[in-house]
Amino acid sequence: MEKRGDVILGVEDESGQPVSALSILSLLERVSTIIDGVQASQQRMEERQQQLEGSVSAVQSELLKLARDHGATATTVDKLLQKARRVSTHVKEVRSRVEKQNVRVKKVETTQDELLTRNKFRVVIYQGEKEVPSVAVTKTPKGAGLAELEVEPDEYDIPADLSSDEEYMVVEDAESSRGARLKQSGLKGIENIKAAFSKENMNKTREKTRENLSKTKESLSKTGQTLGTKFNTLGEKIVPPEQREKIKQSSERLKENIAKKAPTKESFKIKLKKERTVAEGQEGAEAEPAVTPPKGRKSSPDVTYTEVVTENKREGPVSEEGATRIHED
């Protein structure tokens, strides 16, 4: 074995050129850096996967909250429907009452017409279903209050003088105008109540509530579908299954390439040849006989570098007669 600089004689690569120790060290360093990079990338991928798991758990909790909110909204919708049914029953009762009031108003109108034809004006007040006794209308001064009103029984006396007929007609006209105003205001109020509690308005409100409920249900279903699709797309975008398989395959390929690029025993085979016996005038040919192994050992066809070194260490220096020289190509 001889060393010339950094070149190790006897160690050759596949092309037959000697291999230097520095190149071997550089290759080993590159391999170590590649392995470190792979380990670092694997650690980063693990951290990303942990972050993704945390985000997925947070999304699941939010979905559970949404489901609870959906259940709460369903209960509130049921309550609203029950209230709408109750309101519809109340509306029916109100309609029946309004119809009864209309009948009573018509009766009052007929009685008023009869009284006007007879030149006798009598105020009839209804309180609920009971009829209040009739009261005569009397004039009061403007400054007087309600406490100073005087209620008198019905007395219809024929006026003594002809001049009193004119005053009676003036009072009758004023009272008739007030009655007409009261009648108009009452009719307007009844019409407003009828319009508010009509079948069309109630049907419209019911339809609107149903449409709103259907829209809310559709929006909730759409949000659930969009969330599911988004989560699936996020998982596939971040770490798709194909990419995971590729990562595994790349790690396996790196290991195989490292194992292939590592120096093998065949590259470190030492070609042992005998020393040339050069005679004057003769051309000696290179011979490659088998190396005679030391005593106590059998001969082997291929002797590796490590075996030769160990043999030299055990046996000591080689004598000049049985010395072997490494053939230089």
From Swiss-Prot:
Alphabetically ordered keywords of this record: Activator, Coiled coil, Cytoplasm, Developmental protein, Differentiation, Membrane, Myogenesis, Phosphoprotein, Transcription, Transcription regulation
KW Metal-binding (keyword) present: no
InterPro entries noted in UniProt: Cavin_fam (IPR026752)
Positions where Phosphothreonine occurs in the chain: 292
Annotated region (Disordered), positions in chain: 198-260, 274-329
Extent of the signal sequence: none
Organism domain of life: Eukaryota
Any one of the GO CC terms: cytoplasm
Biased composition annotated in UniProt, kind: Low complexity: 279-290
Regions annotated as coiled coil: 198-262
Predominant localisation class: cytoplasm
Subcellular location: Cytoplasm, Myofibril, Sarcomere; Cytoplasm; Membrane, Caveola
Regions of compositional bias (Basic and acidic residues) in chain numbering: 201-220, 242-260, 310-329
Compositionally biased intervals (Polar residues): 221-232
Biological process, per Gene Ontology: muscle organ development; regulation of gene expression; T-tubule organization
Family: Belongs to the CAVIN family.
Function: Induces rhoa activation and activates nppa transcription and myofibrillar organization through the rho/rock signaling pathway.
Name listed for the protein in its UniProt record: Caveolae-associated protein 4a
Species name: Danio rerio
